[in-house]
Amino acid sequence: MVPRAAGGRLYSDTMGRLTFILFLIYSLPVGMHHLLMDPEHGNATKFIQVLLTAFVSVPTLLTIFTITASLEIAGRLRGGRGLFGWIAALPWERPMVLATGLAFVMLGFGDFGGMINMGYDMNAMVHNTSWVTAHFHLIFGGSVVIMYFAIAYDIWPRLTGRDHPSLSLLRLQLWLWCIGMMVMTLPWHWLGLQGQWRRVANRHAPRGRLRGDNAGTQASAVAGRV
């Protein structure tokens, strides 16, 4: 969808299919690195999660390369010259292209935080702090959700047969989402380095309430996986 919106073509269909398969293999259980230092997880499990996090960085980089190469093709077809001239030649007024660029910005910060979470030593500095919260908000709430918006903008006219009343409003919404995520998460990173807690048990939980909370947590986990 992104290459088509930019006026180009996909750089490599094979690489796109390969990254999809690698993500299916490596990324489904990899979110446990957000809990890497929690004592209920054994050392073997933690080691496996570190490996999976390292492995999932490969299809992530392949995806970034493929999309960037596809956008470069589109930019050069539109007359872009020089090493970076193709970037300015892209149709940034189109919501799908703009969302991709903003997603890359948030993905860069989010991936950097993920690499910190991956390491035993560096993870010990930021575990259970707002750094971790900032990381996964940038990855999912930032780069993933903004692309959901762009896909919805692209699909809606095809489903309804009606054009959007204003592309300016769509672009404004994308910019506001990106700016809002950055304003929220960058201070979280800094506060995490200062030791701001992510989770804290600051009240007594009666046994009955605890059982109810556990049941709700397990139901949410099953529903989320489904």
Regions found by a protein language model. Give the residues of each.
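Hydrophobic cores of alpha-helical transmembrane segments in multi-pass integral membrane proteins
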Residues: 1-6, 13-36, 49-73, 94-120, ...
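Membrane-interfacial, low-structure loops and terminal tails that flank and connect transmembrane helices
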Residues: 74-92
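Glycine-rich, flexible loop/turn motifs
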Residues: 127
